[in-house]
Amino acid sequence: MATKDPAVTTPDDSQLEAGRGNTGNNAGDALEKPSSSTGTMVDEPADPNVVDWDGPDDPEHPLNWSKTQKNLHLVIVSLFTLAANLAATMFAPGAEELATEFSITNSTVTAMTVSLYVLGFALGPLLLAPLSELYGRLIVYYGCNFVYIAFTIGCAFSTNVAMFLVFRIICGCAASGPMSIGGGTVADLFPQEERGKAMALFTVGPLLGPVIGPIIGGFVSENVGWRWTFRIILIFSGLIGVATVIFMRETNYTVLLQRKAQRARKETGNDKLVPKLTRNETPKQMLVRAIVRPLKLLIFSPIVLLVSLYTGILFGLIFLLFTTFPSVFQDVYGFSPGTAGLAYLGLGIGMILGLVLFSVLSDKMLKQKSGAARPEDRLILMKWLGPVTPLGLFIYGWTAKYAVHWIVPIIGTFVVGFGSLFVVIPGQIYLVDSFGAEAAASAMAANLLVRSPFGAFLDLTASPLYESLGLGWGNSVLGFICLLFTPVPWFFYTYGERMRTHFKVDL
């Protein structure tokens, strides 16, 4: 058994620590690995009224499910996040068409048709992540998909801008569910040494969705109108919803043990049976505590705050960069609107290459570490490859300013995509490994709470930024901002374990 990380403390720590060595692993290991029911690993006899897993090989424990079953869950959750993020930017090329149809003359209102959806990514997790940790992941997936489909239909058939904006932010809140609790599902299903590749696939949606979206949306809006962008998302989300109902099962350990205890009480007639790690709290107290968890992590954990700020800056810069593509590739290089959309492929290909490299190296490097792996070991690739992002911004900005051959600024965006992947994915895995299955959803919710407003509002600064400084210095400013955060993984790689010990967060 691995040691519970001091970054998370619960009233049951004394139970969790019994019989464990001091291996210094993550907070979720106490729940991730089924404990033996033989009593050979504990100093005191097990309470006969406490329902636990039936040993480390209990087939009901998600870590012991078949590889096919685990991967199927991972693919469905990853498709959820892809659909959510496609919708963030897929509509963007049709925003001007909507503005014309609804007689919108204010450019800020037009921008809000995109940014309000991303703002929903920050608001939804405050409720959805806690609900998943109290009542299970599956019911949240079901509910979010139902609401998302219903209000996507509303967007497709909106008759005025007020209706559209309200439906749009509700869609964003619903779409945030899989994004905030997906990390918890990954932590439920995969042990730490297999989590890198799994999290890489899960993060494909938030990274590639905004890149692919405008390419698809540009051709759809140009040929069949902006409303069809929502109909396509509706069809995609509906198919994912059907797959969820057919193939997915509950993975939350606490909920599974509660159900197991409920079955045991019914079968034995012993009403004293309780699941392991039960808290003596009312449902209202548990819900309030769970809702506060993401905020407590942001306030009291420097790790969560700084990693979330770093990933948020990168997320916002990518959205801001998108706003420059039409003017750069249409006005400077003379591309047609449809062809200009292909300029997004530079970012996308850079991310795909980074994703492949990360998937190959991350878990392999972790397994090669002598002794117990630390969550901080996830930051090695972030330390060395994250700093290439500002280099890409410098290349893109200055070559576009001087109209160097169009392939060179696209190479710059390729470098941005490659480098940003090595910030966002390691950052998220670091949070999941640090807090484990017990609090992964809350850690991801805290990350989204910081990250999403950057994506929603940073692009609104594009016009004043580039009008004042131009493409060269404008993108250089963004590059220098990225450089300011490059010491973050170096600092946490050296001092992260000490900080998790010092800054304990009572969840």
From Swiss-Prot:
Transmembrane segments: 72-92, 111-131, 146-166, 169-189, 200-220, 228-248, 302-322, 341-361, 379-399, 406-426, 429-449, 472-492
Residues carrying covalently attached carbohydrate according to the record: N64, N106, N252
Entries under Gene3D superfamilies matching the protein: MFS general substrate transporter like domains
GO MF, one example: transmembrane transporter activity
Pfam families in alphabetical order: MFS_1
Topology relative to the membrane: Multi-pass membrane protein
Keyword Transmembrane belongs to the record: yes
Region Disordered, annotated ranges: 1-65
UniProt entry keywords in alphabetical sequence: Cell membrane, Glycoprotein, Membrane, Transmembrane, Transmembrane helix
Domain of life of the native organism: Eukaryota
Record's keyword annotation contains Membrane: yes
GO cellular component: plasma membrane
Job description of the protein: Efflux pump that might be required for efficient secretion of fusarisetin A or other secondary metabolies produced by the fusarisetin A gene cluster.
Protein name, as recorded: MFS transporter fsa7
Lineage: Eukaryota, Fungi, Dikarya, Ascomycota, Pezizomycotina
Gene that encodes it: fsa7
